[in-house]
Amino acid sequence: MNLKLLFVISNDEKTLNRLINKFTLPFNTLMHGDGTASQGILDFLGLHKTKKNILMSIISSYDEDGIEKFIREESKIPEIGKGVAFTTPLSSSPKYIEEAYKERVGDNMKNKSPYHLIITIVKEGNAEKVMNTAKKNGANGGTLLKGRGIGGKNSFKFFNMTVEPEKDVILIVCKDNDKNKIMKAILDKNGANTDSQGICFSLPIDMTIGIDE
């Protein structure tokens, strides 16, 4: 079953909702996060601290080209600094999700982009340290996610991992040849044996929009 995880990071929530409705995406999560551009850059551009909407949705490869076309033609994401969008392959998924897409899924996987998504989870308040380390080793920026409990619980699920509310989740898209250097630096400076108590892992990315365009 050829399913992928779509990430769209943008401050345009209306366009994200249009995307969900147009392609009838049944399995999606819309969250809020903060961009990590430095305050000096934001001041120079006359901008306030960047607030972002993060859409995560499971899609089939059958829909990927249409979704990419929609984002490129009907959103501002391709414009510099307006957001990013990318997909990453899913190695496994629940049977009910596979059944929902069964009749629409293509057979061939495509890997069109030499990028990776680095996901870092650290104690709350340490995200800036992670981004400073990452930028010194080739990263251009990232997105900070703030989790909150659902249904009375004080933790939330991210990639099937339980993340406590006092944790920050940082998403960084980087070039393949920078991935190992960035991850090693993050783990050295902000890993499990440091005050940040961090972990990080990476996922390959397929389609990308808003990255080096």
State each model region's role:
Residues 1-213:
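Positively charged, small/polar-rich N-terminal and surface patches that mediate targeting and assembly
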